[in-house]
Amino acid sequence: MMAKNKEPRPPSYTISIVGLSGTEKDKGNCGVGKSCLCNRFVRSKADEYYPEHTSVLSTIDFGGRVVNNDHFLYWGDIIQNSEDGVECKIHVIEQTEFIDDQTFLPHRSTNLQPYIKRAAASKLQSAEKLMYICTDQLGLEQDFEQKQMPEGKLNVDGFLLCIDVSQGCNRKFDDQLKFVNNLFVQLSKSKKPVIIAATKCDECVDHYLREVQAFASNKKNLLVVETSARFNVNIETCFTALVQMLDKTRSKPKIIPYLDAYKTQRQLVVTATDKFEKLVQTVRDYHATWKTVSNKLKNHPDYEEYINLEGTRKARNTFSKHIEQLKQEHIRKRREEYINTLPRAFNTLLPNLEEIEHLNWSEALKLMEKRADFQLCFVVLEKTPWDETDHIDKINDRRIPFDLLSTLEAEKVYQNHVQHLISEKRRVEMKEKFKKTLEKIQFISPGQPWEEVMCFVMEDEAYKYITEADSKEVYGRHQREIVEKAKEEFQEMLFEHSELFYDLDLNATPSSDKMSEIHTVLSEEPRYKALQKLAPDRESLLLKHIGFVYHPTKETCLSGQNCTDIKVEQLLASSLLQLDHGRLRLYHDSTNIDKVNLFILGKDGLAQELANEIRTQSTDDEYALDGKIYELDLRPVDAKSPYFLSQLWTAAFKPHGCFCVFNSIESLSFIGEFIGKIRTEASQIRKDKYMANLPFTLILANQRDSISKNLPILRHQGQQLANKLQCPFVDVPAGTYPRKFNETQIKQALRGVLESVKHNLDVVSPIPANKDLSEADLRIVMCAMCGDPFSVDLILSPFLDSHSCSAAQAGQNNSLMLDKIIGEKRRRIQITILSYHSSIGVRKDELVHGYILVYSAKRKASMGMLRAFLSEVQDTIPVQLVAVTDSQADFFENEAIKELMTEGEHIATEITAKFTALYSLSQYHRQTEVFTLFFSDVLEKKNMIENSYLSDNTRESTHQSEDVFLPSPRDCFPYNNYPDSDDDTEAPPPYSPIGDDVQLLPTPSDRSRYRLDLEGNEYPIHSTPNCHDHERNHKVPPPIKPKPVVPKTNVKKLDPNLLKTIEAGIGKNPRKQTSRVPLAHPEDMDPSDNYAEPIDTIFKQKGYSDEIYVVPDDSQNRIKIRNSFVNNTQGDEENGFSDRTSKSHGERRPSKYKYKSKTLFSKAKSYYRRTHSDASDDEAFTTSKTKRKGRHRGSEEDPLLSPVETWKGGIDNPAITSDQELDDKKMKKKTHKVKEDKKQKKKTKNFNPPTRRNWESNYFGMPLQDLVTAEKPIPLFVEKCVEFIEDTGLCTEGLYRVSGNKTDQDNIQKQFDQDHNINLVSMEVTVNAVAGALKAFFADLPDPLIPYSLHPELLEAAKIPDKTERLHALKEIVKKFHPVNYDVFRYVITHLNRVSQQHKINLMTADNLSICFWPTLMRPDFENREFLSTTKIHQSVVETFIQQCQFFFYNGEIVETTNIVAPPPPSNPGQLVEPMVPLQLPPPLQPQLIQPQLQTDPLGII
C-alpha cells in the first residue's frame, strides 16, 4: 500500500563522456573538450561555465574528495524535460586521465587498467566522491557546493564519445581517430548505446568533420552530433538523443545540423542582448555603477535571461561601454556648448575689429588673458585636458576651459569671429548708407508702406548688399524717425495754433462745429498733411491735445516729466532747502549779538575817515545805541587796494554788514562796481554763503562846502544805486556840519545793519514765528511753457540767487517769497511759477496782481501759447514779457528768433507792457533789478486790480473759485523809510537789438528777507482752504450734453432797439441768482446724449443756431444776461465794455488785452475768417433767420460788447467804432448787385458744400467716375448700403427721414476707407445710420448726381401740363445724363421705388422720399432768391422719377398717380409725412449742406 501511494520517480540514467585522454604526448597540449561539454550541459548558465579544466593535478588534489584517487569525475545530475513532457534524471560521468604535476605521468589509481578499458566500464564505484564543478574547487571543496555521488556507485547506461574536429593542440587527427576507433570497439562490447559528439565545431575543420561522419557511417546506429560548448550549441541535443536511444518509449532522436542550431542559439543571444541593452539605455547618468544598477535589475526577466546566456562579465562590459558612451556624449555636448559660447566670449573680450584685425591666434589669446572680464568667460584648470577633470561635472560653471582654445576648432571660431566683425562692419556701413539714401528721398512720407518705396531703391548699392530683412529694418527705423518727427512737429504746430484751442475755459467740451473749425484751419498746414497716411494717429494726437487743453493736469502734460510745474516744484524743493540750511547756520552764528563786525568800503581814504569818526564816538571800541552797548570791530578797506577781495575772504572775520561811503560820482561808481564783484564772486565760486548775504549800507559823506551843487546829484544817484542794490541809503542830514560824517548818520546805518541781521534771524528762525509766512503785498504769477528749450533754473535764478528769497507757505510747492524795497518800503512779493496750462485756471479765478510771461524766442509755439494766454488777461493787470534766447547775436543771425523777439516787443508796446530779453549765455540774467520797475507798476495799480477783482467776485457770488494762493490777513511792519525820488525805480531799457547785453536778470545780491506790508489790509474775498495742489489738476468732469443758449440779436450798434430786444429776451428768461444753468428755451434742449448729433431733415427753430462750444453746467465761465442795461450800474466784466450808465459814473470796465493789441486780436480774428471764408452773406440760406453763434464765450467776448480796435476808437464804448473793411465790402456788394445782369441771375451756380468729414479719404468726396468701372458701374459703398437697407430695414418707419447717429455714420465711412470689404451687419449699426451714410456719400460728391446743366431743362419739362408728354420729355432728359451718372441714378431711384412700395409700413411715400432726397441729388443753389418759387417743382421731379421708375429706366408702363406738381395732402392725419406736405418752404438740407447766413459784423470780430 505504501509503495502504491508513493509518487513515481523519474527514470535515472548515467551517461559517461569519453574521448581521447592521457599525457600531452597522447592528446596534445589541450583536451578534446569533454569537461567543457559536461560543464555546459550540467551548468548551462554562462556564469557557471568554466572554459578551462586542467587534467594535471597534484597528488593532494588527486587524492581529494572530488577526484577521490579516481580517473573519472562526477559532474552531478540534471533533471531534463523532454518534448513529450516526460522528466528524467541524468547523471554525468567524465572518464579522463589525471597527470601528476610532478612526474607528468598518470596518477596511480585503484584501477590500473588503461584508459580504453577503464572508459568502457559500465559500473563505477567511489565512496564519498563529491561532484566536480571547476578546477578552483580542488582543495577548497568547502567553498563550493558539496554533493556526493549517489551511494558511491553508478551503473553506466550509455556513452558519449567526444571527437575534437578543430585544428591545433599539436595533435594529429588521424592519431585521434585511431584512438577513437579502438575506444569505440571497447565500448561496443558493453552493449550500451553510443553517440559521437563532434566538439569545438565553432572552430571546425570540414575535412575532420567529414572523416568523423564517414567513421560513423560505417558503424551501425552510430549518430554524430555537431556541438560547441563555447556557444552552447547542440549540447543538450547530445544527451537528449542518447536518452531517447535508452528509452524505447521515446521518439527517434532528431539531430539538428550545427549551422541551424548555431543560428537558433545566436538568435536567442541577440534577442536577449537587445533587451538587455534597452534596459541599460534607461541609465542616463554616467556616474552610475554596475553594482547599483545590477541590484535594481536582478529581478528583471530580460536581465536574468541575458545573464544566463552571456554572463555577468559581458553584462558588466556592456554596461561599462554604455557608461563610457554617456560620458563621451556629455563631453561632446559640453565641447559643443563651449564652442558655441566662444563667439559670445570673443564678442565680450575682443569686440573691436581694429584691435584684432591683424592679430594671429596666439596674439589674440594673450590679449584676451589681459582683459578684466577674462575670468568671467574662461577658467584655467590645474590639470589638463579639461575633459579628464571634474570640470566636466560642474554644470553651473559655464566658463570655458582655457586649454580648449588650443584646439583647431577654437582657432576656427576666432577666425570666423574676425570675419564676422569685418562683415558686420560692412553691413552696418551699408545699412547706414541705405539709411542716408532713404533720407535723401524726399517723397517718403510718414506711414508710407515699404512696398511703395522699394522700387525706387532697387538699384542702390547698399540695398543690393544688405538682406531684405535688413532693408525692412532700416526702413522701419527710418519710418519711426520720420513718424516721430512728424508727430513732434504736428504737436508743435498745435501749440503754435494755441489761439485756436485756448478760447474756452477749462473742463468744457468742444462741439462738432468747433472740431470742424479746428480741422479747417489745421488742414492748410504742411505738418498736418504730413500725417495724411496716418490719419488715425493724427486724429488721436489731436484729440489727446484737445483733451489736455480742456482738462489740463501736470500728470497728463504732453511734455511728460519736462512739465514746467514738475520742474519748478523739484527745483524749488532743492534750492529753497539749501537756502534755509545756509541761513540756519547764519542764525546759529549770529544769535545774541553783542559784537558787530563791519567792513567799511571807500575810496581815497574815506573808509579810514569814517572808521576814525566811529571810533571817536566810541569808548574803547564800544558804541552805545538805543540803550545797549555794542562792541565794534571795524575793518576799513580801500577800494584801490590790490588785495581788496582777499581781505574779504578771511575765515577769522565774519562781517555783519558793510558801510559804503562816497562823496563823489567817481567814488560812488567804484562802490557800485566792487559791490557787484563781491556778490558775483560770492555767488559763483560759493566761497562763503555768509558773504553772499552781506547787508550793504550806502552813506553819503558831507561836503565841506554846504552849498555844493554836487550834493543833490550825489543824493539822487546814491538813492538810485541803493534801490538797484536793494540796500538802505543814509543821506546827509539837514543843516551845516563841520565834519564829513554826522552822528545821526552812523546811528542810522548801525540800526539798519542790526535790523537786517534781526530780519535774517526772523526768516530762518527755527522757533515758530507769530507772523504768517503767506502774507504778501503782491502776488505775481510767472508763466513758462512746458518743453521750451531752456532750463527752469535759468528763469528762476533771479529769485533764487537773490538774498531776499525764501520759501512760501507750506503746501505751495510752486511759489516763493521775495522781500524787495519798492518805493519807500520793503515789500513782500509772492512769485508763483506755473506752466501756461496751469495758469489758465488762475487767470480767471484768482487774485493776481501781475504776470511775468516768459517765452522762448527759438520756438513759435511758445509765442503762440503766450498770445493765447495774454489775450484773455484783463488789461488792468500789468504784464512783463520776457524773451529767452542764447545770446544777443541770435537776433542778428537768426531771422526766426528776430521775428519772435520783435513780435514780443511789439505786443508789449501795443498793450503798454514791459518787455525784456534774457540771454542764457550771459551772467546778467542773474540780476533782479530788471523787475523793479514792473513791481513798482504793479504796486501802483494794486488797489485798482483788487477793486476789479472784488467787483467781479461780487457779481459771481455763486461761483466757487479755487485758489493756488493761500492768503491770510496781513499787518504792516515798517522797516526803513527812504527819501522820495521820482526816478528811484528806473528800469533798464527795453530790449534793443543794437544795445549792449541786455540786463534782464542780475547777479546775486544780499539775501536778507523782509516782512513788510504796504496796506495792512485783509482780503476776505479770495481766502480759500489750504490745499497742496490746485483742484484743476485733479478734476476731469465727464462730457456734458450741450445746452443751447439765448442767441445774440443781429445788430450793428448799441441802439435803443437793441436794448429792447435784449430786454425782451431777458423777460422771457429772467436770471436767477441761485441758478448756474445757462438760460435756454425748453423746446431748444437737445434730448440726445450725443452732443454732436444733428437732425438733417428738420429745420432748427428760427433764431437759434449750432453752438461752436458746448459749455457744461459747472463751467467756471457762464453766460450772464443782465436784467437791464439801464438799472444795472455794476456791469458784467466779461462783456469787456462799460455801459453808458457806468460810464456816466466815471468807472471804466476792464477789458481783455486782445482788444488792446492789434497783433493779438488779428491772430484770433484770422482763425475765424479762415474757417468761414467759404461762406459769404449771400451764400447763406436766405429764408432762414438763424445766425451762426460767435466763437467766443457768452458775452465776455461778444463782438457787440467788446472793444475791437482800441487804437482807433478808444475802449470805454467800443460799440460806436465801425469796421471800415466791412463797410467797404457792403458798398461793393450793393454796387455789384445793381450792375448784375438779369440773365446771370438765372444761371445755375455750382454749390460745393464743405465736407462733413474731418478725416482724409481716398474714396469719399472723389469724382464718381473714379469710383466705378465698366464691370462694376455702381460704387461699392452704394451697393453695400442699399443691400443692407433692403435686407434689414426696408420696413423701418421714417427711413431716410429720421437721421441716424452721426458718429455711427462717420464710423461706417471710416471703416470702409480702411477696408472696402467690411460687413455692415457685423458693425451692429442702425438702418438709419447706414441711410445717413449713403446720403452723405452723394452729398460729398464734387458734382451732384443730377448734373447742374440739366436743371433748367428738368424745370421746363416739369411745367408741361400734359402728363404723358411731360414724362416723355423727362425721359429724354434723363438719357442726356453722363453714362456713369445714369447708371448710379437708375440704381438709386430703383432702390427708392422699392422703399416707397412699403410706404404702408415705413410711412415713406414717393413724395416723402423726394422731400428727403432731392436736395442731395440735385445740390440746389439756395442763394438764388428766384429759386424759392421752384423748389416744389424740383422736388416733384424727383418724386416723378421714383413713382415712374419702371417707365424711365425699364421701358415699363406709366403708373397712374395723383397730380405730380401739386399733390394734395394725405387724408390720413396720423402719417409722419403730414407736416411735410403743405410746407411751401424748401425742404431741409443735410447738415453738411447748410451754411448759416453770417450777419454783418460791425466791429470786425469775424
From Swiss-Prot:
Transit peptide found in the keyword field: no
Domain FF: 267-325, 366-420, 427-481, 482-548
Residues the record lists as 3'-nitrotyrosine modifications: Y550
Tissue expression remark: Detected in skin fibroblasts (at protein level).
GO biological process: cell adhesion; epithelial cell migration; mammary gland development; positive regulation of epithelial cell migration; positive regulation of mesenchymal cell proliferation; regulation of cell size; regulation of small GTPase mediated signal transduction; Rho protein signal transduction
Domain pG2 pseudoGTPase: 779-944
Site feature location: Arginine finger: R1297
Molecular function terms, GO-annotated: GTPase activator activity; GTPase activity; SH2 domain binding
Biased composition (Pro residues): 1036-1045
GO cellular component: cytoplasm; cytosol; endoplasmic reticulum; plasma membrane
Subcellular location: Cytoplasm; Cell membrane
Residues recorded with modification Phosphoserine: S590, S765, S951, S968, S1115, S1173, S1176, S1195, S1202, S1218
Membrane topology: Peripheral membrane protein
Residue stretches making up the Rho-GAP domain: 1262-1449
Record-linked Pfam families: FF, FF_RHG35_4th, RhoGAP, RhoGAP-FF1, RhoGAP_pG1_pG2
UniProt domain comment: The pG1 pseudoGTPase domain does not bind GTP.
Protein name (record): Rho GTPase-activating protein 5
